[in-house]
Design a protein with these regions (language model features):
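Glycine-rich segments within core transmembrane alpha-helices of 12-TM secondary carriers
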Residues: 11-39, 55-56, 249-261
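Symmetry-related core transmembrane helices of the 12-TM Major Facilitator Superfamily/SLC fold
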Residues: 46-65, 278-296
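Extracytoplasmic gate region of multi-pass secondary transporters
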Residues: 114-164, 257-261
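C-terminal ends and interior cores of transmembrane alpha-helices
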Residues: 188-204
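Hydrophobic core of transmembrane alpha-helices in multi-pass small-molecule transporters
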Residues: 207-224
Length: 321
């Protein structure tokens, strides 16, 4: 939300993608620490993640102390403070009646009453069913592809590169061609990259290609995911509900990811470890296809909208008299 509100309409997705891509390159620390502190001994994995955790905490504290409030929020706040008290009370009463005062329950209620956010939620439900591939690539490399710890470390050196590259691509495509085209293109890219990851690992191609492919999948998948659940949710919500509405996306990710995990728990005992990768590939297809269809048919384009004036009702069909 902060990045989006600090950007103009024409460069919103691009700026979001640039910041995220730079952050992703920071995960090069993981293979570097695997090769140095962990020394490719799997029992020492906790040492690898301790250093990035400390760095992340320090940077979050730095942002908390020194980041300024966004102009979008300040404009709304100043406008409110300049309003006479009587008018504020009347406006507050009207906003309460319209469920527009913030909070997760209010945001959910508001979202299901309005066409755009309602179908974005449905699209996200489909999309996050395919999220298993983002959390299981280490298992696929170790159990299905039978890669050694050294090979996995080499693959992880190219993972952030592929991830950052496809993240950048999604941002530039989104601002140039629109949100819908981005979701379709990056979803197709995610399927292609995951297939390449499986083939490269299973047929013992170079681990660098394996790492780049899974990085490309992650960048493509979350490039589409950020566009659906991050950018489009924000661009389809009024300012006073924007943060709460984006929390819905996070909750959907957890709920649908949990459902996908339950499905795999049922399948894993009856599927050989060698086939895990193919199983995860098969589970990504229905969710991504469903999200593409819903986005294309039922969700309106949001590129170029002014976040200061969005009400969330722009896509509602006129009520019949």
């Amino acid at each position: 939300v902060y990045i989006l509100e600090c950007s103009d309409e024409k460069s919103r997705a691009r700026n979001y993608a640039i910041v995220k891509a730079v952050a992703i390159l920071g995960t090069l620390l993981v293979p570097l620490l695997r090769a140095t502190l962990m020394q490719n001994v799997s029992e020492r994995w906790h040492v690898v993640y301790l250093v990035p955790a400390i760095i992340g905490f320090v940077m979050a504290l730095f942002a908390l102390l020194f980041a300024k409030e966004t102009n979008v929020f300040l404009t709304k706040r100043i406008e409110y403070l300049k309003t006479p008290i009587e008018e504020r009370e009347q406006r507050s009463k009207e906003e309460r009646e319209q469920n527009a005062q913030g909070g997760i329950l209010t945001a959910v209620n508001f979202a299901f009453k309005h066409r755009q956010l309602r179908f974005l939620i449905i699209a996200c439900c489909c999309f996050y069913l395919a999220s298993l591939g983002t959390a299981t690539y280490s298992t696929v490399m170790a159990k299905s592809a039978l890669m050694t710890e050294e090979e996995i470390t080499l693959a992880l050196f190219l993972y952030p590169v592929g991830n950052a590259l496809f993240t950048l691509i999604s941002g530039f495509v989104s601002d140039k061609f629109g949100r819908k085209i981005t979701i379709i293109a990056m979803s197709c890219s995610a399927l292609a990259c995951y297939l390449l990851f499986i083939l490269s690992g299973m047929f013992k191609w170079t681990p660098y290609l394996t790492g780049f492919a899974i990085g490309g999948f992650m960048g493509s998948y979350w490039g589409a995911g950020d566009t659906i659940g991050g950018i489009m949710f924000s661009e389809s919500s009024p300012t006073n509900l924007r943060s709460s509405v984006t929390v819905i996306n996070t909750l959907l990710n957890g709920v649908m990811g949990g459902l996908a995990t339950v499905i795999t728990m049922i399948l894993l005992p009856i599927i050989p470890e060698k086939m895990f990768g193919y199983m995860y590939l098969g589970l990504t297809v229905p969710g991504l296809v469903g999200a593409i269809v819903i986005m294309w048919l039922f969700v309106g384009e949001t590129r170029g909208l002014d976040l200061k004036t969005v009400t969330g009702t722009e896509w509602d069909k006129p009520k019949k008299n």
